[in-house]
């Protein structure tokens, strides 16, 4: 029988009680006959567990390697959003300092997170970091990048408008970027730039 279980991983958010429940079930199972996929599934069903690897060590030891999900941001300032686009209750003890703010209608967190990933992939390669992404009730998109510069994409043709922003950025037409308050791309053939303190 299994008499020893080792747990490995940097566990900040995973419920120890949830793990202990599975560990108690695992103990005294037959070493050769234990259903690893069953226990892997039970462990991966625990909040914040991204993946689990189970290794057997002869003659009676099981090693559990748990990988914790990352916190990506705050959803509507009241829930945590993980790297899989799932929401969790806000626990102040496990909240990193600089979280991206996600705003949107209830039930649309996956859409907002997917759009964030799309925009972030393009922006981060240009040295631009997203602070906030918002989808309002009308379906209008606004991205806020550091240092607190709003990029207003509106409701329609958002991909085209975002590409227009990237083109302008790539052509170095946005001088003194940090002095900009917002860039409004909701126009069919151009954009408006408002400078800070203007």
Could you describe each region identified by the protein language model?
Residues 2, 14, 47, 57-61, ...:
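Extracytoplasmic
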Residues 16, 20-23, 36, 40, ...:
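Extracytoplasmic/secreted envelope proteins and their assembly/folding machinery
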Residues 156-198:
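Extracytoplasmic/luminal low-complexity segments enriched in Pro/Gly and acidic/polar residues
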């Amino acid at each position: 029988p299994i008499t020893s279980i080792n747990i490995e991983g940097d566990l900040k958010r995973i419920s120890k009680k949830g793990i202990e429940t599975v560990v108690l079930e695992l103990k005294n199972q037959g070493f050769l006959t234990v259903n690893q996929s069953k226990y892997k599934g039970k462990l991966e069903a625990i909040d914040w567990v991204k993946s689990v690897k189970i290794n057997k060590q002869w003659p009676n030891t099981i090693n559990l390697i748990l990988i914790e999900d990352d916190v990506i941001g705050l959803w509507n300032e009241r829930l945590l959003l993980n790297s899989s686009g799932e929401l969790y209750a806000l626990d102040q003890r496990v909240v990193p300092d600089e979280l991206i703010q996600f705003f949107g209608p209830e039930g649309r967190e996956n859409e907002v997170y997917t759009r964030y990933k799309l925009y972030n992939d393009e922006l981060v390669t240009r040295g631009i970091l997203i602070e906030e992404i918002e989808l309002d009730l009308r379906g209008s998109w606004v991205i806020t990048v550091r240092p607190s510069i709003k990029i207003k994409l509106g409701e329609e043709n958002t991909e085209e408008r975002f590409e227009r922003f990237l083109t302008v950025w790539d052509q170095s037409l946005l001088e003194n970027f940090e002095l900009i308050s917002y860039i409004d791309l909701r126009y069919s053939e151009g954009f408006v730039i408002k400078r800070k303190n203007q």
